[in-house]
Amino acid sequence: MRLTENQKELIREVSKKNIRSSRQAALKCLGEVENLDDQWFVEMCSRLLNEETSMYDLPSEIQGLLTVEDVSETFHEDRYYLSQREKKIFDQIIKMQGVTEKLALKDIRYINSTLMYGVPGTGKTMFGRYLAYKTNLPFAYLNFSNIVDSLLGSTAKNISKAFKFAISTPCIFMLDEIDAISTRRDISTSASADKEMSRTTITLMQEFDHLPNETIVLAATNRIDRIDEALLRRFSNKYEMTVFNNQEKKEMITKYLQAIEMTISKQDMNNLINGKKSQAETITELIQCIADTLMKEQI
């Protein structure tokens, strides 16, 4: 059977596991089908276009350890505000990805890895989802506090299981609360706990070193001071994520409101931007403000 250009594009994008591009190609393929005789092909394209379809059915052994999301269906770029500091981080990561691809051609392993640190609620995870959206890669999220196991050696095994996906599939690999396991080895707790933590940290670094150049690693922590120095050296970039100043909060709120075509009073705006609230706290209060406004309209 002679393939059309759209069908060739579909095969290319599916092989690269680019969900968004695969769906766009599938839509083009369905548009050029003159009859429904090829039942299997039509059914496969239709399933691909179904937003519930996931190209990343995880093995049972890592379900609950790792979550993988196609953010093209869930991320609202029009509501997301990128500060100038975060834009610099984003630009650096994108430039570095081009470098890693060139290094891969020379058979040189190099991981595009960034560690984001700072107080909670400053948008570390949301930045990871934004990066996945812009790069058209799946967002693989691993929260280290969820993989700690009381059984001896089990935490290290859980890490190895979770890393299998990122090693085999190019993605944005988000390592959240990385300080939960990779504690500096000079911070002593108990002899048995120290051995287990050391074993876990070594496993993490070994798995980290096996990641392909195509995978982009983002790690997040609130306690960079507790992370093992050998692991810190594996991150090519380290950035502090800080609470927005009042002007940045105002711009963030304004963009969100414009996206949903709503407004709030000047007093509400001042209440939202003043104080030391984090980005997450500000957005939570904004949504409550919007809900209150809509509630008043119902009365």
Regions found by a protein language model. Name each.
Residues 4, 14-15, 22-26, 30, ...:
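Conserved AAA+ ATPase small/helical "lid" subdomain
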Residues 18-76:
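Interdomain "pre-motor" coupling segment immediately N-terminal to P-loop NTPase/helicase cores
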Residues 71-113:
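Pre-Walker A (pre-P-loop) alpha-helix and adjacent loop at the N terminus of AAA/AAA+ ATPase modules
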Residues 110-142, 160-168:
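Walker A/P-loop
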Residues 174-175, 202-206, 215-221:
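Structural recognition of the conserved hydrophobic beta-strand(s) that form the central parallel beta-sheet
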Residues 187-209:
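Substrate-gripping "pore-loop 1 plus following alpha2 helix"
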Residues 223-236:
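Short regulatory helix/loop adjacent to the ATP-binding pocket of P-loop NTPases
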Residues 236-250:
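Conserved AAA+ ATPase "SRH/arginine-finger" region at the nucleotide-binding site
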